[in-house]
């Protein structure tokens, strides 16, 4: 495996969305179907820095920073999932994207799947990894992260950990990558959240995870897009790693059997942020898959 790059060699682009500026990467040819890369918590378009170069020679690659994250503006919001839906919907319309291929991860997967379910005629393919799915009980949450995420979801304790101590950036993120993240990489991820007041989205997201039936509105939304995925013929590309976090190998095997038109790719060792452990394989497999769509 080649050395994993730490640089972010992309010019900044901004678009006004619902009165705020959202930052995004935009590279590659303008003809053909654009590929929309959606990150999750607590990351940004930086997560895709070593994957986009594999895809950009042939396809337009667009990677926004979700509202309140990365280089996007940080309005005074509660940062519920529905807030992100509103801003992402408006972002896609502001850029005039008629059809897209989605490349999605973590909460970016929930946003992407939810958008695809509502706009199926505009989706040519979905590549996904470590995506948000209903977790029926805490026993199915990875043991190494169980107590931490239960604490994140305990009102005062969770805010102390994530808002005051920055525990999602300093703890959860590096613990969910197999290799050690460098200080340069960690500083890229720290940069948007140096001030506690800006960490609201980092706290909200783990409290929206659909675990053990709560919160009910997110469980229902995620179950709805999972039902759609199991019925939709849209081409799917699922990356998984060992041991994984949200999609362990056994779950990947079940999905390979149950999802129509789904190809799976084993990236080797990986936890949650697979893009930080084997980006070249992910990027090259996406580039190989796209021409058939």
UniProtKB/Swiss-Prot annotation:
GO terms of molecular function: haloalkane dehalogenase activity
Pfam family, one: Abhydrolase_1
Domain named AB hydrolase-1: residues: 34-158
Catalytic activity: 1-haloalkane + H2O = a halide anion + a primary alcohol + H(+)
Keyword Hydrolase: yes
Enzyme Commission identifier(s): 3.8.1.5
Description of how the protein assembles with itself and partners: Monomer.
Protein name: Haloalkane dehalogenase
Organism classification: Bacteria, Bacillati, Actinomycetota, Actinomycetes, Mycobacteriales
